[in-house]
């Protein structure tokens, strides 16, 4: 390489540093060797360097977005064992992965006994949304209610609801696994009401909708919740066995292995209301 060539190369290096393109800088020498060997021309080399840099930036973006979404454990649809859950319509799940339900601000309900893959599917769909550049927030129902209760005590409830309403997709995991604290149903109602027809949700539960009155400790609040959550909804029911128990099935008693069907009742025909003396916009605990 001539002196002029070395000078130009150093100028390119400085430019890549100034533009904060570390991957392109890292690949520069190897790319130049490919040009010298006649493997690629200048245009192809430029395309290769830019693609390498873009790939790195996209990887970093996704990693940061997953952390912001609280998706610390990444699951994918590719790793989901559809063969183990024959009751599950794979085509329907893959259609959800196109994320049109997010654009339509719909609620996706994943219902089934424990261990049937509800959280895996919810996480995988959330990961797809992150990759597509959509904002996501993932939490269990217990975590959401605890955060809302804390915000209420600190006089920050409106701000917390506004924060949880910003995400294009809110995933609420494990509805029905833990008892809802007193007043928690009303707090969750306020969040659902704020997101209604504005933001999409994925909700997982091991309890049928008919049991939500028991889950939330108030059938009236449960009806108001279901009124909104079933208005624009997709309901996926999994009637299979537990992934976590399949390798130890012989150790589990038959009455534990048997699954309980979770059949959703028809959606409420009229809009539900919170308890007497409570406004629709600001239920009290």
Regions from the PLM with identified roles:
Residues 1-25:
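Charged, compositionally biased N-terminal leader segments and the immediate start
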Residues 11-14, 30-34, 79, 107-111, ...:
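Short hinge/gating elements
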Residues 17, 21-73:
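Interdomain "pre-motor" coupling segment immediately N-terminal to P-loop NTPase/helicase cores
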Residues 21-24, 55, 101, 169, ...:
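Generic structural signal for secondary-structure transition and capping sites
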Residues 56, 61-95, 103:
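Clamp-loader machinery-focused feature within the broader ASCE/P-loop NTPase space
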Residues 88-166, 215:
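Conserved P-loop
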């Amino acid at each position: 390489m001539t002196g002029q060539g070395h000078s130009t190369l150093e100028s390119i290096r400085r430019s890549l540093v100034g533009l904060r393109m570390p991957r392109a800088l890292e690949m520069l020498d190897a790319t130049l060797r490919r040009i010298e060997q006649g493997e690629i021309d200048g245009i192809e080399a430029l395309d290769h360097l830019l693609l390498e840099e873009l790939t790195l930036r996209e990887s970093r973006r996704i990693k940061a977005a997953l952390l912001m979404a609280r998706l610390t454990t990444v699951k994918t649809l590719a790793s989901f064992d559809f063969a183990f859950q024959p009751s599950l319509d794979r085509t329907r799940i893959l259609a959800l992965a196109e994320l049109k339900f997010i654009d339509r601000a719909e609620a996706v309900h994943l219902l089934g006994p424990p261990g049937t893959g509800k959280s895996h599917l919810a996480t995988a769909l959330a990961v797809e949304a992150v990759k597509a550049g959509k904002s996501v927030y993932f939490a269990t129902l217990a975590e959401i209610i605890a955060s809302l209760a804390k915000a209420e005590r600190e006089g920050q409830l409106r701000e917390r609801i506004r924060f949880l309403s910003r995400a294009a997709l809110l995933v609420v995991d494990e509805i029905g696994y833990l008892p809802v604290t007193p007043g928690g149903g009303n707090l969750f109602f306020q969040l659902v009401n704020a997101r209604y027809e504005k933001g999409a949700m994925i909700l997982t539960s091991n309890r049928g909708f008919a049991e939500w009155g028991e889950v939330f400790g108030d059938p009236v609040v449960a009806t108001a919740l279901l009124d909104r959550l079933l208005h624009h909804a997709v309901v996926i029911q999994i009637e299979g066995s537990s992934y976590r128990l399949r390798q130890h099935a012989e150790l589990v008693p038959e009455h534990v292995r048997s699954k309980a069907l979770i059949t959703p009742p028809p959606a409420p025909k009229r809009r539900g209301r919170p308890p007497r003396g409570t406004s629709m916009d600001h239920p009290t605990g």
